[in-house]
């Protein structure tokens, strides 16, 4: 099992930080990734586990009790092909992208998911359409 050993650094854009770590781990075929936890990151990881893109995740308390750490395991097939083929951040700190539920995008014609931040919390585009809620498009995962 391969794990990351680099020191954990805070990032000003938690979505970009998480997506970059997922993408780099996917390309390097790492099993386990560790990052600083936030409510938004945990909500995104819950969606990715529920949709089958990640195996699992665990939130741990840091030894100094100042910051929580989240560790997650990427999911691979028996041939070591990652379940996540790609991730793309859509809404960024300098340019937020909001859409009503009628105009929420289909990622790869429904084969991927869009992660949406709504007034009811973070959810996939499919759930947002069912609830008829629009929101900020955080990322695409396929």
UniProtKB/Swiss-Prot annotation:
InterPro entries: Ribosomal_uS8 (IPR000630), Ribosomal_uS8_CS (IPR047863), Ribosomal_uS8_sf (IPR035987). SUPFAM superfamilies: Ribosomal protein S8. One of its GO terms (cellular component) is ribosome. One of its GO terms (biological process) is translation. GO terms for molecular function: rRNA binding; structural constituent of ribosome. Keywords: Ribonucleoprotein, Ribosomal protein, RNA-binding, rRNA-binding. Pfam families: Ribosomal_S8. Belongs to the universal ribosomal protein uS8 family. HAMAP family: Ribosomal_uS8_B (MF_01302_B). Part of the 30S ribosomal subunit. Contacts proteins S5 and S12. One of the primary rRNA binding proteins, it binds directly to 16S rRNA central domain where it helps coordinate assembly of the platform of the 30S subunit. This is Small ribosomal subunit protein uS8. The lineage of its organism: Bacteria, Bacillati, Mycoplasmatota, Mycoplasmoidales, Mycoplasmoidaceae. The gene is rpsH.
